[in-house]
C-alpha cells in the first residue's frame, strides 16, 4: 500500500503520455514501468547516454529515439487515446502527433514484455558514469 501511495505522489503533476505510458506498460508487460524501468541501464528513465546495456535498455533507447522524431508536439505531455483488444494495444487517434506518440509507447511496452527474460538486476539504478561509450545513431 505504501508503494502505491509513493507512485501516486510521483505521478502528481505528470500529465498525458507519461501516465498513459505507465498504464500501457502495466497492461502489456504486467509490471510497473516506474518500478522496473524508471532507472535501468543507460536509457530507461530521464535522459540517456552511451550504449544500451541489453535488450531491455535497448527498448528505452528506441523509445527515446522515437520521441525525438515526434514532430510539432511534446511527446511527454500529449494525451492520446488507445484501447486493448485481445491483449494488443490499438492507437486510436487520427491526430498525427498523438498517433505517433502512442505508437512509440506501444512499441516500447511490447518490447518490455518481449524482453522480460533479458532483464538484469545489475542494470537497475545503473550509474551514469558507466554510460560513456559513443552512442549509436537512432
Swiss-Prot record:
PROSITE patterns linked to this entry: PA2_ASP (PS00119), PA2_HIS (PS00118)
Predominant subcellular localization, coarse grouping: secreted
One GO-annotated biological process of the protein: arachidonate secretion
One GO term describing the cellular component: extracellular region
Binding site for Ca(2+): 43, 45, 47, 64
Protein name: Acidic phospholipase A2 Cvv-E6f
CDD domains: PLA2c
Co-factor(s): Ca(2+)
Pfam family, any one: Phospholip_A2_1
Amino acid at each position: 500500500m505504501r508503494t502505491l501511495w509513493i507512485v501516486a505522489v510521483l505521478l502528481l503533476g505528470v500529465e498525458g503520455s507519461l501516465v498513459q505510458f505507465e498504464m500501457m506498460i502495466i497492461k502489456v508487460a504486467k509490471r510497473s514501468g516506474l518500478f522496473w524501468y524508471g532507472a535501468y541501464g543507460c536509457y530507461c528513465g530521464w535522459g540517456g547516454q552511451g550504449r544500451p546495456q541489453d535488450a531491455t535498455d535497448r527498448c528505452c533507447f528506441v523509445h527515446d529515439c522515437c520521441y525525438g522524431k515526434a514532430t510539432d508536439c511534446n511527446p511527454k505531455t500529449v494525451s492520446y487515446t488507445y484501447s486493448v483488444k485481445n491483449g494488443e494495444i490499438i492507437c486510436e487517434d487520427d491526430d498525427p502527433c498523438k498517433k505517433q506518440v502512442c505508437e512509440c509507447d506501444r512499441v516500447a511496452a511490447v518490447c518490455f514484455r518481449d524482453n522480460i527474460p533479458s532483464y538484469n538486476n545489475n542494470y537497475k539504478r545503473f550509474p551514469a558514469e558507466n554510460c560513456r561509450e559513443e552512442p549509436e545513431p537512432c
